[in-house]
C-alpha cells in the first residue's frame, strides 16, 4: 500500500540563497543567416534518447501531487484538486511560508488531510526529492518556472508548468531532453485550450465543419493596469519593486505570453501531428505605457523598456497555413484572445462574441438542418442554428467535467484542464499537451525577439520534435475504454471517500492544530500524537480501498 497521508509539519522546511533569472534571449542559441532568413539551429538529440510523441506512463491509481508557487494562480489549483477524486495533495510550497500554510484551508474545508509545508527560495528542492510524489504542479513567478520544473524532472516526477512554461529556447531544449531522458510527462498548463468555445471549435475542426483551416488568429490582449501592483516583488532581484511581470516586460522583447492565443489554434492546425511551424516574422510598436509606468514607480527616466506595447507575430507552417498572434497587456481595450479560424468552408470567431459562419449546404453537411432559407456565410449563423451546431459538436471533455467546472470559477477551463490531466495519469494515457507543445508555444518570445532585433527579419523555427512532427496524423484527445474508465473512476471515488472518513475519524486536523500551537516543551509530544494518528488513518484507508 502506498503511503496515503504525509506527516505534515515534520517537513516544514525553509531554504534561501538562490536567485533565478530568465531572459528571452538565451546565450546557447545558435543561428545563421540563409538568404535573408535567420535559421535557428536544431540541436542533435543526445545518444540514447527517444522522442516522447504520444508518451504513455504507467497508470497512477492515486495521483500524489505537490504544488510549488502559491501566490496568484497556485491557490486556485490547490482548491480545484481538492474536488478531483483519486488525488492526494502531499505538499505545498511557496517562497513565503504563510502563503503555503494558507492553502491548508482548502484541504481542511474539503475534509482532506494536512499537507507538508515547504518554503524559502529553494524549498522546492527538498520537496522534489521525496519518493512519494508523482506530479509537481508549478505555479511560481515566471523566473522560477524552469528551475522548479527542471528539478522535478531530474527527480523523476511528472511535471505540469503554468504559462509561459519556458522563457527561452535554452530552457525549451533542456525540458525536452529531460522529458525524453526520464520518460516523464512535462505538460504546459494552457487553460485556454479548455475554454468551452475553443473545445467545441476543435471538435468541429476535426470533423471538417470549416473545411480545411488555412488561417488562424490568437492573442492575449488584457490591460493589466489593475494588476501590476499585485505581482510578487522578489526581495533578491527587484530593487525597484516593479513586480516580476512588469520587470520581465521591461527587460525582454518578443511575445512573452503567447500561449493563451497560440495553444488552441495550434491544436486545430495539428502542430507536430502532421504539420509544423516553419517561419516567423514579428513586429512591435514602441513602448509607451510600460515605460511610463516604470517612470512613475521609480521617479527616474526609463529609456530601455524592451517590450513594445503591442506585439504581432506571423507564422507559416510546412503545409502552407498562416497564424497571427498578438500580445498587448498595456493599452486600454476589452479583454480579447481573438481565436479566429478561417477555413475553406467556414469561419469561427470567439470575440467580441462567439459566432460561426457557414452557408446552408455546409451546415446541412455538418449534421444541422437550417431553419431559415437565406442562410449565407456572408453573415453569422442565427441563434437556433448556432446552438444546434454547438450541441452536436459538444466536446466529451465538457460533457464530463463542464458542469462542475463552471462551479469552480474562471469559466470552468482551469478545472477541466486539471481534471483531464489527472484522468490521463490515472488511465495511463498521453496527456493533452506534451513537452513539444510547450516548446512550440513558448518559443515565440526568443524567436520574435530575434526577428525584431534584426529589422523584423524572417526566422526559421527549429524542429523541437527533431524529425517526428509528422509521425501522428491529426491532434486528438486520448480516452480510456469505457469499462476501464469506469473502474478507474470508481477506485478514485472510493479512495477519496475513505480518506475523508478517516481524516475525521482520527481527528487529524485537531491534532495538526495542536501541533501548530505547541510550545517547545510540548512540540515532540504533539508531533508524536499526530504521527500516530496519521499511521492509523493510512492503515484504515488501505484496508478500505485494498490498495497494494
List the predicted regions and their residue ranges.
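Bacterial N-terminal signal peptides
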Residues: 8-16
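N-terminal Rossmann-like dinucleotide-binding module
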Residues: 24-110
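Predominantly a Rossmann-like dinucleotide-binding segment in NAD(P)-dependent oxidoreductases
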Residues: 185-187, 192-305, 455
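Positively charged n-region of N-terminal signal peptides that target proteins for export
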Residues: 1-4
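Sec/Tat signal peptide C-region and signal peptidase I cleavage site
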Residues: 18-22
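A structured beta-alpha segment of the ubiquitous adenosine-cofactor-binding alpha/beta core
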Residues: 116-134
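C-terminal helical cap and adjacent loop that interface with cofactors, partners, or active-site loops
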Residues: 24-39, 43-47, 53, 75-76, ...
Amino acid at each position: 500500500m502506498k503511503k496515503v497521508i504525509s506527516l505534515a509539519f515534520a517537513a516544514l522546511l525553509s531554504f534561501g540563497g538562490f536567485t533565478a533569472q530568465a531572459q528571452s534571449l538565451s546565450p546557447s542559441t545558435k543561428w545563421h543567416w540563409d538568404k535573408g532568413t535567420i535559421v535557428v539551429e536544431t540541436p542533435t538529440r543526445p545518444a540514447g534518447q527517444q522522442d516522447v510523441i504520444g508518451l504513455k506512463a504507467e497508470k497512477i491509481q492515486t495521483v500524489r501531487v505537490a504544488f510549488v508557487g502559491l501566490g496568484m494562480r497556485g491557490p486556485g489549483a490547490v482548491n480545484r484538486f481538492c474536488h478531483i477524486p483519486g488525488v492526494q495533495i502531499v505538499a505545498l510550497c511557496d517562497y513565503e511560508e504563510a502563503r503555503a500554510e494558507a492553502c491548508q484551508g482548502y484541504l481542511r474545508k474539503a475534509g482532506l488531510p494536512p499537507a507538508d509545508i515547504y518554503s524559502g527560495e529553494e524549498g522546492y528542492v527538498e520537496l522534489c526529492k521525496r519518493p512519494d510524489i508523482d506530479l509537481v504542479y508549478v505555479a511560481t513567478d515566471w523566473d522560477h518556472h524552469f528551475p522548479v520544473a527542471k528539478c522535478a524532472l531530474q527527480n523523476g516526477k511528472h511535471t505540469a508548468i503554468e504559462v509561459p512554461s519556458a522563457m527561452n529556447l535554452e530552457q525549451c531544449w533542456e525540458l525536452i531532453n529531460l522529458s525524453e531522458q526520464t520518460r516523464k510527462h512535462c505538460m504546459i498548463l494552457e487553460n485556454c485550450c479548455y475554454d468551452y468555445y475553443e473545445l467545441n471549435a476543435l471538435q468541429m475542426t476535426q470533423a471538417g465543419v470549416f473545411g480545411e483551416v488555412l488561417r488562424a488568429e490568437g492573442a492575449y490582449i488584457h490591460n493589466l493596469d489593475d494588476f501590476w501592483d499585485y505581482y510578487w516583488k522578489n526581495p533578491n532581484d527587484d530593487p525597484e519593486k516593479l513586480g516580476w511581470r512588469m520587470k520581465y516586460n521591461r527587460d525582454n522583447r518578443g511575445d512573452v505570453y503567447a500561449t493563451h492565443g497560440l495553444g488552441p489554434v495550434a491544436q486545430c492546425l495539428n502542430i507536430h501531428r502532421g504539420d509544423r511551424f516553419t517561419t516567423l516574422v514579428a513586429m512591435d510598436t514602441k513602448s509607451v505605457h510600460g515605460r511610463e509606468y516604470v517612470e512613475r514607480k521609480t521617479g527616474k527616466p526609463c529609456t530601455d523598456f524592451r517590450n513594445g506595447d503591442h506585439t504581432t507575430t506571423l507564422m507559416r507552417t510546412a503545409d502552407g497555413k498562416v497564424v497571427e498572434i498578438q500580445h498587448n497587456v498595456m493599452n486600454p481595450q476589452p479583454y480579447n484572445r481573438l481565436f479566429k479560424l478561417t477555413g475553406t468552408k467556414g469561419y469561427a470567431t470567439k470575440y467580441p462574441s462567439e459566432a460561426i459562419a457557414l452557408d446552408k449546404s455546409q451546415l446541412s453537411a455538418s449534421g444541422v438542418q437550417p431553419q431559415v432559407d437565406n442562410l449565407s456565410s456572408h453573415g453569422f449563423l442565427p441563434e437556433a442554428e448556432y446552438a444546434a451546431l454547438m450541441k452536436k459538436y459538444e466536446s466529451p471533455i465538457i460533457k464530463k467535467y463542464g458542469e462542475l467546472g463552471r462551479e469552480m470559477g474562471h469559466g470552468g477551463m482551469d478545472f477541466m484542464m486539471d481534471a483531464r490531466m489527472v484522468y490521463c495519469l490515472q488511465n495511463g494515457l498521453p496527456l493533452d499537451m506534451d513537452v513539444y507543445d510547450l516548446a512550440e508555444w513558448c518559443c515565440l518570445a526568443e524567436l520574435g525577439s530575434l526577428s525584431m532585433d534584426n529589422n523584423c527579419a524572417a526566422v526559421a523555427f527549429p524542429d523541437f520534435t527533431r524529425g517526428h512532427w509528422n509521425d501522428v496524423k491529426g491532434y486528438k484527445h486520448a480516452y480510456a475504454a469505457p469499462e476501464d474508465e469506469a473502474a478507474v473512476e470508481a477506485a478514485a471515488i472510493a479512495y477519496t471517500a475513505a480518506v475523508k472518513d478517516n481524516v475525521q475519524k482520527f481527528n487529524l486536523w485537531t491534532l495538526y492544530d495542536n501541533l501548530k500551537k505547541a510550545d517547545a516543551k510540548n512540540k515532540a509530544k504533539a508531533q508524536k500524537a499526530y504521527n500516530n494518528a496519521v499511521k492509523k488513518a493510512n492503515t484504515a484507508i488501505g484496508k478500505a480501498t485494498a490498495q497494494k
